[in-house]
């Protein structure tokens, strides 16, 4: 399961900073923090986003490599990802793999999947994933033990099951 943790913000009081930026054309009232929250709510309601772009956040995202690839396509952010070229995925705490839930293809929306309550299918899906992980893990370990470079050995690891960590920085 993916999880996200806030690492840092560009300021200890983002609300006050966003309001300050929004009041650029009203210098006499620019430092008024009493109405900052109300102003930020107004900006959101009326979709005035430019003041939010003045403040930044950095988040830590723990997910699988296939989801990470989808995230990094958003080019308005800067990314730093755990490198399997230099480190073994086992360096991330816990088991370096994540078993995926059993979901069926939605027949009406190809970009959607739906839950299933088929217990037998779920058992088989978990067993198949474990077989892939066992095989890939053994091949990866064999490659490392035989001097194969990590950057080459990592190619056998399953993208959708192998965990990764990335840091994402962008504007609020």
Model-derived features: where do they sit?
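Family-specific signature for flavin-dependent thymidylate synthase
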Residues: 1-172
């Amino acid at each position: 399961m993916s999880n996200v943790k806030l690492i840092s913000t560009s300021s200890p009081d983002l609300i006050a900073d966003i309001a300050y930026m929004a009041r650029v054309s009203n210098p006499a009232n620019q430092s008024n923090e009493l109405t900052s929250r109300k102003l930020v709510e107004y900006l959101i309601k009326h979709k005035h986003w430019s003041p939010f772009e003045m403040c930044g956040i950095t988040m830590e995202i723990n997910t699988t490599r296939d989801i990470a690839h989808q995230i990094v396509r958003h080019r308005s952010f800067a990314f730093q990802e755990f490198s399997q070229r230099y480190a073994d995925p086992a360096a991330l705490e816990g088991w370096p793999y994540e078993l995926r839930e059993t979901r069926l293809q939605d027949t009406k929306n190809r970009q959607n999947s739906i839950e299933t309550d088929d217990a037998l299918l779920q058992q088989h899906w978990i067993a198949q994933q474990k077989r892939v992980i066992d095989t890939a893990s053994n091949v990866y370990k064999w490659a490392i033990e035989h001097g194969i470079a990590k950057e080459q050995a990592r190619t056998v690891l399953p993208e959708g099951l192998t965990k990764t960590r990335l840091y994402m920085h962008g504007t609020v």
